[in-house]
Swiss-Prot record:
GO biological process: long-term memory; medium-term memory; positive regulation of gene expression; short-term memory
Cofactor annotation: Mg(2+)
Source species taxonomy: Eukaryota, Metazoa, Ecdysozoa, Arthropoda, Hexapoda
Protein name as annotated: Serine/threonine-protein kinase meng-po
UniProt-listed PROSITE patterns: PROTEIN_KINASE_DOM, PROTEIN_KINASE_ST
Sites of Phosphoserine modification: 334
Pfam families tied to this protein: Pkinase
GO molecular function: ATP binding; metal ion binding; protein serine kinase activity; protein serine/threonine kinase activity
UniProt EC number: 2.7.11.1
Entries under SUPFAM superfamilies matching the protein: Protein kinase-like (PK-like)
Length: 456
């Protein structure tokens, strides 16, 4: 093979201070260098070294990158999204974290990777480094995740990946923006979120996933842990983790190490190592599970197995219109939202709706009431349209004393206009009259005192 003269482009990141976030700039330098292509391995005669400028820009700290103008990219194809499916094969420079970063803390750590909050010393920029265990993945899989994340970063609700990628002795690493409020899992309480917050989140996520689907990409691992929060009121959330992202139509295996409640039923039925066609309807299923999880704080079932999981069997009968009875764990939702769930959580993948279908239900009321799983709970429908219609009675059953339960019940009755004032003096007189007519063996003094205690 001969030598090929190419331009070496150094990606830059423009940091936006004051808004807690940053945006990527795809502009490149015009510095040229000679690159030699031997056996499809791209090597540059001029090493990529970390540099910074005084203009507020952070240049690639030891990053390997390929410009979209490089010959590895083709002219975009209107049918397949063009260059986004052409994953460049780039050699990652070898360095250590300490070369340019101060590790402030570990945000998360899993089987395959750990997430580190770091400060880039040359520019004093706070970034997040995703370090994937080199012995548990391949360089090709790492490059695919980094490439998809970077190419999708310009969408407002997809986490920005910087043009920074390198390897250490144990990890493959790339840099991302920092989400100050963590993931969605750490922001959802045991009873879920307000209906309005759920609508905000679902609208942003459907936009991000719809953008991916327009590029013929399927996320395949949609769950609350992969949604990052940038504002406390959920007006800005972003989709992350593209390790399982795949081009539509390819044959793939099941995603490992994910919640079984998020796995579509057609994938649960597969035998081990059996491959299946990757389709966007799997994201639609996971989006429906996500909606339920945000509203309630829990998944609707353990697994979408109608034989082993009774909760799913009940919903499947309702979804297929074999019964008109709404499953108990869905009774709090409005008919319009139930229609939405039917479309997203259809057992037959061919009947599932597109990911953007939720936009049709944004003006509808989603939650009519909440009911406790306790059989002794009382069902109350709200009358105030400005407050969330999520009300639980007896949600802390057994933790409150008898007096506290009485006071709590009186407050609720008074709120809904059901509290009737009682003349306690009249009650006492009637009790004494009743006691005076009792049997001669009845002790009026002792029993009347006991009765009065019960009334107070």
């Amino acid at each position: 093979m001969g030598t090929i003269e190419k331009r070496s482009f150094s990606f830059r990141l423009r940091r936006s201070f004051g808004d807690g976030g940053s945006t990527n700039s795809r502009n490149s330098n015009n510095n040229s260098s000679t690159c030699t292509n031997h056996n499809n391995q791209k090597r540059c005669s001029t090493p990529l070294t970390p540099t910074s400028t005084s203009t507020g820009r952070l240049e690639v700290p030891g990053a390997a990158s390929v410009s979209r103008r490089s010959s590895i990219y083709k002219k975009p194809d209107k049918n397949d999204g063009g260059q986004i499916h052409l994953i460049p094969d780039v050699e990652l420079p070898l360095m250590t974290f300490a070369d340019q970063y101060n590790i402030e803390k570990t945000l998360a750590e899993g089987c395959f990777a750990k997430i580190l909050l770091c400060r880039h010393r040359p520019t004093n920029t706070l970034v997040v480094l995703k370090a994937v265990h080199a012995e548990l993945t391949t360089i090709k899989e790492f490059q695919k995740e980094f490439h998809y994340n970077y190419e999708l970063s310009h969408h407002h609700h997809i986490l920005s990946a910087y043009a920074v990628a390198f390897q250490t002795m144990d990890y493959y690493v790339f840099a991302m923006e920092h989400a100050p409020y963590g993931d969605l899992a750490s922001n959802i309480g045991p009873n879920g979120l307000h209906e309005n917050a759920c609508k905000l989140i679902s609208e942003q996520l459907s936009s991000a996933l719809g953008f991916m689907h327009s590029k013929n990409l399927v996320h395949r691992d949609l769950k609350i842990e992969n949604i990052l929060v940038f504002t406390p009121d959920f007006t800005r959330v972003k989709l992350c983790d593209f390790g399982a992202t795949t081009k539509k139509g390819l044959l793939v295996h099941k995603v490992k190490h994910t919640w079984t409640s998020c796995v579509p039923p057609e994938q649960l039925e597969l035998i081990k190592n059996e491959r299946f066609q990757c389709l966007p309807v799997s994201d639609s299923w996971q989006f429906g599970i996500l909606l339920y999880n945000i509203l309630t704080g829990n998944p609707p079932w353990q697994s979408a197995d109608w034989v082993k999981d009774q909760s799913y069997a009940n919903f499947m009968k309702y979804e297929q219109r074999k019964t008109t009875k709404v499953p108990d764990n869905f009774r709090r939702f409005s008919p319009r939202l139930m229609r939405c769930f039917r479309k997203y959580l259809s057992h037959d993948p061919e009947d599932r709706c597109k990911i953007t279908e939720v936009a049709k239900y944004m003006k509808d009321r989603w939650v009519e009431c909440r009911i406790s799983t306790s059989k002794s709970a009382t069902l109350i429908s709200p009358t105030n349209h400005d407050q969330d219609s999520c009300i639980y009675l007896n949600q802390r059953e057994g933790r409150l004393s008898g007096d506290e339960n009485k006071l709590r019940f009186k407050r609720m009755m008074s709120t809904y206009g059901l509290d009737i004032p009682i003349d306690q003096a009249m009650v006492r007189r009637r009790v004494w009259d009743w006691l005076s007519t009792c049997d001669a063996n009845f002790d009026p003094d002792v029993e009347s005192l006991h009765a009065l205690d019960l009334l107070q």
